[in-house]
């Protein structure tokens, strides 16, 4: 029998970040295609986007790790959320395994590793989309926030356990190590997950050693809609950065490079490095956080989008949005953003993380004019995402027949 129902599982029932946005957007796409969608989330509120005749929402109204007023409760439920596991099992029993696929979009902010027990018990075919690196890395990023560098230590190895890489406090690292150990043990993830979707080749390379040898891997890039009309970027002179102003995002490096190269710089975002950026380049403009619509307006001023992130990323949204609108991108070859950048065609790639190299890349991008975006548009279109989703679901159901 063909796919009829999808049970989508995630931490949030509202769009509060990229992971939740993809889960909710995919629910809408599936519902519009006639699939009956059950949307299961730990935390509310429930987005109005889930108001659809083919979508049924189950929200547990639980606190997330970040907004739980009881730190003790946050710590314990973050390690093992009994209520979420029991509720998910109850919901799974409502569905016919011959016509239903469960699609999980994460657990790290509220659901906890406990849901791994339900995901791996064989009751329903399960697809797990990796939106970060928590299936392997305790801090979810393969990044040492203290040394400000990509981490190549084996997760939960002796060198991992004895390194304080957490952005906040060593106690957070200890807790996250415990959670990772629980996920691998009683949570049975990731080794017992049979179908895993990855959103970039960069992510897959980092994660592959920690997944089961016989896992079924599925390429499933996130859908990205074009944010507006094409931009005549060659008429602009401002280099634009969009995102959190924190060390791993490389904003301060960009500020120094833009000043060295003598180019105007616009920072769209905020964060702990804002003051350091102002001191490094007083003439640069920092907007603070703005709406998605205002981000698109800022891109209309861009000669290029600069994406100086210092870590792998997974499938960063803003570089794709910029390219879709005709704005070239400058980034490092180590980030997932590099997968959509063709050096010298629609952007500039570099191999080293220093001010001089980035400044040189800013100069080089001035030689880039108009470029074709049609291939990228097809690759990340919502229509292609839906087609790929349905194909994966059908393949999974076929294996169970």
Regions found by a protein language model. Name each.
Residues 288, 343-344, 348-355, 363-368:
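Conserved acidic donor-binding segment of nucleotide-sugar-dependent glycosyltransferases
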